[in-house]
Amino acid sequence: MSYTKFSKEVTKWLKDNGLPCYGTANDSPEETKARLDAWMRGSKEILRQWITEKRYRELISCAHGGWYQDDVIFEPLAEHFVANHLFDELRFLCERGIRFSAEDMLSTIQSEKKEHGSLDIETIRNIDVPSYVAGRSYSHLGEIAKYKKRALDQIIRYAGYLEQIHAPAEYLEQVNVLQESVSDLTIKTKDLKPFRFRL
């Protein structure tokens, strides 16, 4: 819902400013690029407006929806929360993605253990994730490595934000423990309980 509102406001802003907002299959590459550039400009403007209006829940919903690359909404919003010491908003923004990636990894680990009786951790560590993702083959071990990398990237980014915002030491320690358990694949579902914060 928030994504729809956001998109409508971007479209309105583009129209009000005489910028292209609709394309066709017959558009030239130049026309398509101009439209996409205009959309990005409009997105940044509406993001700025919504931040000024403190429409944080809606922006977090947009970020969680996955319709935009992280550098469009997620990262600028996280940086705003850090700069303004909005710890609860930062938690709500960041924890969900980490939890989902870790849950996906746990689910795939369970499937692998059910199918093969054990987990080959060394093989998982040696998987080149970008090559696996670019390929067309599927394997539980490759998926575990993919989710592990995604979760670790998210945790490391979050830990950086937490250090900047001077988060409570005990919470930062929980994040570090989670990072270790994801890294060595010893994570359990109960380890994610502290990461279910809601506004």
Regions found by a protein language model. Give the residues of each.
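Alpha-helical solenoid scaffolds that mediate protein-protein interactions
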Residues: 66, 97, 104, 151, ...
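N-terminal alpha-helical interaction modules that lie
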Residues: 2-67
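Generic helix N-cap/helix-start motif at coil->alpha-helix transitions
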Residues: 29-40, 66-75, 101, 128-136
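Conserved small-residue packing positions in alpha-helical repeats and bundles
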Residues: 47, 78, 135, 142, ...
